From Swiss-Prot:
<dbReference type="InterPro" id="IPR045240">
    <property type="entry name" value="Ribosomal_uL4_euk/arch"/>
</dbReference>
<dbReference type="InterPro" id="IPR013000">
    <property type="entry name" value="Ribosomal_uL4_euk/arc_CS"/>
</dbReference>
<protein>
    <recommendedName>
        <fullName>Large ribosomal subunit protein uL4</fullName>
    </recommendedName>
</protein>
<comment type="function">
    <text>Forms part of the polypeptide exit tunnel.</text>
</comment>
<dbReference type="GO" id="GO:0019843">
    <property type="term" value="F:rRNA binding"/>
</dbReference>
<dbReference type="InterPro" id="IPR019970">
    <property type="entry name" value="Ribosomall_uL4-arc"/>
</dbReference>
<dbReference type="GO" id="GO:0003735">
    <property type="term" value="F:structural constituent of ribosome"/>
</dbReference>
<dbReference type="GO" id="GO:0003723">
    <property type="term" value="F:RNA binding"/>
</dbReference>
<keyword id="KW-0689">Ribosomal protein</keyword>
<keyword id="KW-0687">Ribonucleoprotein</keyword>
<dbReference type="Pfam" id="PF00573">
    <property type="entry name" value="Ribosomal_L4"/>
</dbReference>
<dbReference type="GO" id="GO:0006412">
    <property type="term" value="P:translation"/>
</dbReference>
<comment type="function">
    <text>One of the primary rRNA binding proteins, this protein initially binds near the 5'-end of the 23S rRNA. It is important during the early stages of 50S assembly. It makes multiple contacts with different domains of the 23S rRNA in the assembled 50S subunit and ribosome.</text>
</comment>
<keyword id="KW-0694">RNA-binding</keyword>
<dbReference type="InterPro" id="IPR023574">
    <property type="entry name" value="Ribosomal_uL4_dom_sf"/>
</dbReference>
<dbReference type="InterPro" id="IPR002136">
    <property type="entry name" value="Ribosomal_uL4"/>
</dbReference>
<comment type="similarity">
    <text>Belongs to the universal ribosomal protein uL4 family.</text>
</comment>
Amino acid sequence: MKAVVYNLNGEAVKEIDLPAVFEEEYRPDLIKRAFLSAFTARLQPKGSDPLAGLRTSAKNIGKGHGRARVDRVPQGWAARVPQAVGGRRAHPPKVEKILWERVNKKERIKAIKSAIAATANPELVKERGHVFETENLPIIVESSFEELQKTKDVFAVFEKLGISDDVIRAKNGIKIRAGKGKMRGRKYKKPRSILVVVGDKCNAILASRNLPGVDVITAKDLGIIHLAPGGVAGRLTVWTESALEKLKERFE
């Protein structure tokens, strides 16, 4: 499988052979499983204080008094029991609960390969809602892209590649979240836009990540979370030449 390599002016400069991973079969079932495993692995176990609602002098005086046999404080009102104000919860969250959905190692690797191959499928990328003008996927740029230090320079390259509209789509799609998440450090819901995969740590990482919805990752750290947000593959992805070399080393 061959692909076109573009320079920073959006001009096709050569054709290269893609790594074999781009010919992997599309497996949405494995991608979903691997995403849920990676997502739940990030969740922090939570639980209540074992003594919550139990710090009281209330006691049960037993039957024969013509009233409910609940624990009561000397003043007469109920305490400790779940149906009482200030009482314990009946079934509070427990830290022992298993949150992480495990997935087999070979399944996870196959899912990542399948999600990588999905980035080269224009139909899957469009189904995911991305906006772009080019039909030549995957989008590969010269390694000189990694030397860019300014966000405006990165956006200029995106414009020349015909994918800048997707960044604008993400910017216009930022909404205030409904519910209590607003009070918990996640006020805004932000659409996912372009994924940039580079060969190693470089200036372009800092230059690219300020664009709305854009994520930047090295080929070594590339995972299903980046390739298939929400468990849906087909993310619009820009690869550098050096990233493809690292990808070949990783999977072949």
